[in-house]
Every structure is written in C-alpha cells, then in structure tokens.
Amino acid sequence: MEKLLVFHLDDNNLKKLKQVTGALKIRVEEVPSSDYLKPLEMIVNKTASPLIQPFSGDVPSESLIVFCDFTEKKMDKLLAALRRDQIAIDYKAVLTPTNKKWNVMRMYLEMQAEKSAYQKTKA
C-alpha cells in the first residue's frame, strides 16, 4: 500500500493533504523532527536502533513529502490533486534504493542542492 512520509508541513496544508490522500486511500505518516537522523527505510518500516540519537538541531524550514511504494498512476493522481487544491509543498521525492539509506537531513540537503542547480539552469 502507498505511504506518504510528511515532514514539516503547516497545519493548513496538512489538513488539505489528508483530505486528498484519504480520498485516494493513501496512508500519511507525519514524521516528528526527533526522527530526522534515522534512515528513511527505518522510518518507512518503523524500525528502531539504539545507535541513532534523536535529532535535536534546527529543523529545515521547507516542507517535504516522500512517496513510498506508489504506482505511476496513483502518483499522477496525487500530484494532480496537490496542484488542483493548491497544497504548497516545497520538496517532493520518491523513495529509491539509493535514498532509502539517507537520513532525513541528508534528503533535505540533496533536495536543496537539486533546487539550486535547477534554478541556475533556468537563469
């Protein structure tokens, strides 16, 4: 079943997102900032490790969602609904074999770097 990991989304957009995902039968998991040092696969699988300390630093200001186990059709439907309902999310990513090993902070850094590189090509 599809799961959407949600990071640092404001209450208004989170409420709208939950309405959309509920209609599409997509599970939403809000990830607390204390889990930001966990690898994404641990968050998805709800596993723990005594070696990983809770995150206690500054939380990125941008919102992020990570699509887990989505079919192309379901992802297209959700992306269309996000546009239609004007749900503002700064970064959208798909869980891959590579990035599932990253922690949340690494994902944010990669997303910020991609956005910066994209903006340079548009300029």
Identify what each model region corresponds to.
Residues F7, L64, C68-D69, A93-P97:
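Short, charged/polar micro-motifs that form catalytic or ligand-binding hotspots
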